[in-house]
């Protein structure tokens, strides 16, 4: 594969199927012809430039669909498992589910020192959901996107270069940061629930610097607020970017192998895929454990 075509191949696989709003007067080249929009229009982006011009209020349809679909599959699997649960010794899939639940329950008991019925189910959902999203990285990079491309070209008249379709939600920072900022809101909620609004404000305004002198204490409040607000925001940012960075790097290696080796990509991809099984499991575990630790810190009494 030539360098230019390899570069285009990689760029195409890193793009998302994007839905957003283009402004009035925007000149777009889509489906083989050019047009000028007479009014602001919500539409699918035909290329990376359009996706960029849609701005922040655009939706990555593929990431949302796959993350939502995998979440539904996860809930369905556990629902079916719960229906078949009996008082006897579990076997097969039920045994697997029981192992996961006991493993996560142990992690929660070891890491969370408060009292909340929310943490264990939340941890189970986070681990299984993130694991399923990461697991999509093991599917050959061209298998589903090429199928989607064929459908859109054959039945909807799209050009092949317009059919962006990513299937690994955790390689999209919008998904990982969305999950991690949800964790931040839970941190705030549990802090207020445990310590009250005054206690929450106190954790931001009265730490880490303290003083018995009222004047000095008042002078330290802006500094404490700045430091603690940064620390609060750093938790979800680092949590989301850690997952995104590791999964994006793994996906990029698969794309590079496919671009360089073509139909022989499976030879090079197999060793990396075997190693990547550890990565996808470890990243789901780390995301879950850090969530438990952050929530435990939120309910600790100082």
Swiss-Prot record:
Protein topology in the membrane: Multi-pass membrane protein
InterPro entries: ATP_syn_F0_a_bact/chloroplast, ATP_synth_F0_asu, ATP_synth_F0_asu_AS, F0_ATP_A_sf
One of the GO BP terms on file: proton motive force-driven plasma membrane ATP synthesis
Alphabetical keyword list: ATP synthesis, Cell inner membrane, Cell membrane, CF(0), Hydrogen ion transport, Ion transport, Membrane, Transmembrane, Transmembrane helix, Transport
Family: Belongs to the ATPase A chain family.
NCBIfam families xrefs: ATP_synt_6_or_A, PRK05815.1-1
Stored PANTHER family: ATP SYNTHASE SUBUNIT A, CHLOROPLASTIC (PTHR42823:SF3)
Record's subunit section: F-type ATPases have 2 components, CF(1) - the catalytic core - and CF(0) - the membrane proton channel. CF(1) has five subunits: alpha(3), beta(3), gamma(1), delta(1), epsilon(1). CF(0) has three main subunits: a(1), b(2) and c(9-12). The alpha and beta chains form an alternating ring which encloses part of the gamma chain. CF(1) is attached to CF(0) by a central stalk formed by the gamma and epsilon chains, while a peripheral stalk is formed by the delta and b chains.
Name of the protein in question: ATP synthase subunit a
Source organism of the structure: Alcanivorax borkumensis (strain ATCC 700651 / DSM 11573 / NCIMB 13689 / SK2)
Gene behind this protein: atpB
């Amino acid at each position: 594969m030539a360098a230019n075509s390899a570069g285009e191949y990689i760029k195409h696989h890193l793009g998302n199927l994007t839905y957003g709003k283009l402004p009035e007067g925007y000149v777009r080249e889509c489906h083989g012809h050019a047009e000028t929009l007479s009014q602001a229009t919500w539409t699918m982006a035909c290329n990376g430039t359009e996706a960029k011009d849609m701005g922040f209020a655009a939706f990555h349809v593929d990431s949302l669909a796959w993350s939502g679909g995998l979440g539904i599959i996860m809930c369905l699997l556990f629902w079916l498992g719960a229906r078949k649960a009996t008082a006897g010794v579990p076997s097969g899939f039920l045994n697997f589910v029981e192992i996961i639940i006991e493993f996560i329950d142990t992690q929660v008991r070891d890491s969370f020192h408060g009292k909340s019925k929310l943490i264990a189910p939340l941890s189970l959902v986070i681990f299984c959901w993130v694991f399923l999203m990461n697991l999509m990285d093991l599917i050959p990079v061209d298998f589903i996107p090429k199928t989607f491309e064929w459908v859109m070209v054959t039945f909807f008249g799209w050009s092949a270069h317009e059919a962006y379709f990513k299937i690994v939600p955790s390689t999209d920072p919008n998904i990982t940061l969305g999950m991690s900022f949800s964790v931040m809101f839970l941190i705030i909620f549990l802090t207020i629930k445990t310590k009250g609004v005054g206690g929450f404000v106190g954790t931001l305004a009265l730490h880490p610097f303290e003083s018995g002198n009222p004047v000095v204490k008042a002078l330290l409040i802006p500094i404490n607020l700045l430091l603690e607000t940064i620390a609060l925001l750093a938790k979800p940012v680092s949590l989301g970017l850690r997952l995104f960075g590791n999964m994006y790097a793994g996906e990029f290696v698969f794309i590079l192998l496919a671009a360089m080796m073509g139909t022989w990509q499976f030879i090079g991809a197999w060793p990396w895929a075997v190693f990547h099984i550890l990565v996808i499991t470890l990243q789901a575990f780390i995301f879950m454990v850090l969530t438990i630790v952050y929530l435990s810190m939120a309910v600790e009494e100082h």
